[in-house]
From Swiss-Prot:
Reaction catalyzed: N-succinyl-L-glutamate 5-semialdehyde + NAD(+) + H2O = N-succinyl-L-glutamate + NADH + 2 H(+)
Name of the protein described by the UniProt record: N-succinylglutamate 5-semialdehyde dehydrogenase
One Gene Ontology biological process: arginine catabolic process to glutamate
Organism: Salmonella paratyphi A (strain ATCC 9150 / SARB42)
Active site: residue positions: 243, 277
């Protein structure tokens, strides 16, 4: 029984599915997808639970969320292992994901009060009050790269605001989704407030097409995001928040500390085996001897990265990709770029055929035409050389995406110029592209998304503002508008 609907664990009636470890092929989870009728049942349960949940005092909702945080802390080791085994991440990185989930609780509570909550301004004859109300029933679509942390940011914020939810994890990480929901169950959520439906494309389409849905919060690929946008077009009454991918540039100017720049680049491009939406996909390196030395050192150090199993000791910097098919897609993208005229600086290599273990690849594409503007979700870094900083900014903006952008430079003036001219939601200076603060908004422009539904601004998309002018007494104004006559006529 792998679906949780209206407080009950039930068996899916859709397609049979199983999840294996992407390196060892060990079977981790088996179950059936939710069919369309079960998706509709989950929505009905959420709708029925909404009025009572929304009317709960905020402190009551907060208490359940904080109980969930305590359960995350108590089961940190177990959840770390689930995430690591299911995604192929090294244990150390999965542990940081669970820590981020725990920390997000306190941040989300602060964000609720700062971004939404209630504010009152006293007037001469009353008060002006701003309140926020939940949308109603929201769907949350989770990604596979951070199957615990990223959906958690939506779910916690939405529940605090008083919404009820249907959560569909990625079909590639059903085990993590189920494990997290069982902790919510133990935290004491009332039946129907949060519902779990497992499945792939058909389940997702059934969920996003429900008439009784008030909104959808999505994190994932641009292709799926665009499909959801088309599906919900003509429905302005529904909130649709899309956090999608990026084809992110990292600019390397003249640097004094080459090893520090190489370390920053490795953290930007290859952490999580390149499976972060903010990962550097395009490396823009200034022409000249220093740029040559930087690239040579990057190739040297990146060539020593050996992806390993989730439980290797000593631990590896990167693990496997989410699946062997994902690794094959990265290999095909590398070969495509070679066929276009790219010059391989570091060849990607499958560590073992049939697994998702893939070494990093680096390919130079300076002067190559018709390079696809796409997000290759894996450890493949494309290099362009440039002559001057204005050209670097032009190259950086030469994409339909706009998620993250970074600069390695000692020149503050260059960073100031980049801040003015970069088309990206996150712009970092001498910091990895993959570094982001949960106390700041997270998201991008263009094909990278339409809002900031993650991190600090998540609260904004989980409630709508209600403005009120109010007075405990009704009185006639001392001064009337022109043309109004309230004088009493003498009776004839």
């Amino acid at each position: 029984m792998t679906l949780w609907i209206n407080g009950d664990w039930i068996t899916g009636q859709g397609e049979r599915r199983r999840k294996t470890n992407p390196v060892s092929a060990e079977i981790l989870w088996q179950g059936n997808d939710a069919n369309a009728a079960q998706v509709a049942e989950a929505c009905q349960a959420a709708r029925a639970a909404f009025p009572r949940w929304a009317r709960q005092p905020f402190t009551a909702r907060q208490a359940i969320v904080q109980k969930f945080a305590a359960l995350l802390e108590a089961h940190k080791a177990d959840l770390t292992e689930v995430i690591a085994r299911e995604t192929g991440k090294p244990r150390w990185e999965a542990a940081t994901e669970v820590t981020a989930m725990i920390n997000k609780i306190a941040i989300s509570i602060k964000a609720y009060h700062a971004r939404t909550g209630e504010q009152k301004s006293e007037l001469v004859d009353g008060a002006a009050t701003l309140r926020h109300r939940p949308h109603g029933v929201l769907a949350v679509f989770g990604p596979y790269n951070f199957p615990g942390h990223l959906p958690n940011g939506h779910i916690v914020s939405a529940l605090l605001a008083g919404n009820t939810l249907i959560f569909k994890p990625s079909e590639l990480t059903p085990w993590t989704g189920e494990t997290v929901i069982k902790l919510w169950e133990r935290a004491g959520l009332p039946a129907g407030v949060l519902n779990l439906v497992q499945g792939g494309r058909e389940t997702g389409q059934a969920l996003s097409s429900l008439d009784d849905l008030d909104g959808l919060l999505f994190t994932g690929s641009a292709s799926t995001g665009y499909q959801l946008h088309r599906q919900l077009s003509g429905q302005p009454e529904k909130i649709l928040a899309l956090e999608m991918g990026g084809n992110n540039p990292l600019i390397i100017e003249d640097v004094a500390n080459i090893d520090a720049a190489v370390h920053l680049t490795l953290q930007s491009a290859f952490i999580t085996a390149g499976q972060r939406c903010t990962c550097a996909r395009r490396l823009l390196v200034k022409q000249g001897a220093q740029g040559d030395a930087f690239l040579a050192r990057l190739v040297d150090v990146a060539g020593r990265l050996q992806p390993g199993r989730w439980d290797d000791d000593p631990q590896s910097f990167i693990g496997g990709l989410i699946s062997a098919q994902a690794a094959q897609h990265v290999m095909e993208a590398w070969r495509q770029r070679e066929a276009l005229g790219g010059r391989t600086l570091l060849a990607s290599r499958k560590v073992k055929e049939g697994t998702s273990l893939l070494t990093p690849g680096i390919i130079e594409l300076t002067g190559v035409a018709d390079v696809p503007d796409e997000e290759v979700f894996g450890p493949l870094l494309n290099v362009w050389r440039y002559a001057h900083f204005d050209e670097a900014i032009r190259l950086a903006n030469n994409t339909r995406f706009g998620l993250s952008c970074g600069l390695v430079s000692t020149d503050r003036a260059q960073f100031e110029q980049l801040l003015l001219e970069a088309r990206a939601g996150i712009v970092n200076w001498n910091k990895p592209l993959t570094g982001a603060a949960s106390t700041a908004p997270f998201g991008g422009v263009g094909a990278s998304g339409n809002h900031r539904p993650s991190a600090w601004y998540a609260a904004d998309y989980c409630a709508w503002p209600m403005a009120s002018l109010e007075s405990p007494e009704l009185t006639l104004p001392a001064t009337l508008s022109p043309g109004l006559d309230f004088s009493r006529r003498e009776a004839v």
